Amino acid sequence: MNSKGQYPTQPTYPVQPPGNPVYPQTLHLPQAPPYTDAPPAYSELYRPSFVHPGAATVPTMSAAFPGASLYLPMAQSVAVGPLGSTIPMAYYPVGPIYPPGSAVLVEGGYDAGARFGAGATTGSIPPPPPGCPPNAAQLAVMQGANVLVTQRKGNFFMGGSDGGYTIW
């Protein structure tokens, strides 16, 4: 096939002498101490002493001014409170706090296509599914507040939530 012969052999790579490696082969770290205390109980995590003072304030309501809202504003962010010194530096979310009997307005939370039971005429707020955190309306109901939910705005072009189709 080829009259010139085979390809020339390549020289072997020279063997490196065993010297000092650039990185240490083993890294000696101190062993972490074993846990001696049990983790805190669930009830200890949610005691009022663990709530950050800034997270526990509720805005005052006054109807003395014309046009003043009679509803508490819905908290948009979740406050985070540091825990006591017995627990390592960890932060647990602290939800909005509503006094019992107050009215909370959730704008755009009502879904016209939602049904809460067979023949249900009055709305009820179902509990959150297992493993899911509650939404703002569910938190307010759990704390004894009254919840007013306004209807979500929808139109022909934006579509609704009733599962219908738009044919173009």
Curated annotation (Swiss-Prot):
Q: Under the GO molecular function aspect, what terms does this record hold?
A: DNA-binding transcription factor binding; identical protein binding; mitogen-activated protein kinase kinase kinase binding; p53 binding; protein serine/threonine kinase activator activity; protein serine/threonine kinase binding; receptor tyrosine kinase binding; ubiquitin protein ligase binding
- Compositional bias (Low complexity) at which positions? 1-13
Biological processes per GO annotation: positive regulation of RNA polymerase II regulatory region sequence-specific DNA binding; protein destabilization; stress granule assembly
Location in the cell reads: Cytoplasm; Nucleus; Nucleus speckle; Nucleus, Nuclear body
Query: What broad class describes the main subcellular location of this protein?
Result: cytoplasm
Which residues are reported to carry the modification Phosphoserine?
Answer: S77
The segments labelled Disordered in the record are 1-25
Kindly provide the PTM information from the record. Answer: Ubiquitinated by SMURF2, leading to proteasomal degradation. Ubiquitinated by NEDD4, leading to proteasomal degradation. Following DNA damage, phosphorylated by HIPK2 which promotes DAZAP2 localization to the nucleus, reduces interaction of DAZAP2 with HIPK2 and SIAH1, and prevents DAZAP2-dependent ubiquitination of HIPK2 by E3 ubiquitin-protein ligase SIAH1 and subsequent HIPK2 proteasomal degradation.
Keywords tagged on the record: Cytoplasm, Nucleus, Phosphoprotein, Ubl conjugation
InterPro entries linked: DAZ_assoc-2
Q: Which PANTHER family match?
A: DAZ-ASSOCIATED PROTEIN 2
Q: What is this protein called?
A: DAZ-associated protein 2
The record lists the lineage as: Eukaryota, Metazoa, Chordata, Craniata, Vertebrata
